[in-house]
Amino acid sequence: LKKKVSLPDVIYGETRIVDAEGRSLGMRRLKAPEKLTWKSFRMGMLVCHQSFISKREIAPLYNTEYRLTADYDWCIQCLRRSKRIHNTRLILSNFLEEGLSSVNRKASLKERYEVMCKYYGKVSTILLHGWFAVRFYFAKWFKGRV
């Protein structure tokens, strides 16, 4: 009998940041974790949706109520529905340095906060945002990047 090979429900990898001309500016500050679960996204958008591939069977439609963070919500939903998740450890996408949520940072953060409250609860979301602020300013002051 032939064994049926089952593919992972989600495949993910790394993201390279590029400028408007497509020149590499380096790797994304947040590295994709070795193991990824829906709970991993408590720490923010750890994997760009451009470097996140989901089987259609588990992928919901984007929630268009979220203008800037529908991708974040979508990734969490895919991960909650997945049984097998695979890290390729490869660069799967190039990401333009100034994307839509980068330009609209304040509105994007507000929407992300709403999504996080929905999945992780209000108290843990407030505490995590304190950590995000520390992480952001550490990267800005000591590493010269955001």
Identify the residue ranges that each predicted region occupies.
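Membrane-proximal basic amphipathic "stem/tether" segments
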Residues: C117-V146
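Conserved nucleotide-sugar donor-binding catalytic segment
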Residues: G13, D19, G26-A107, E111
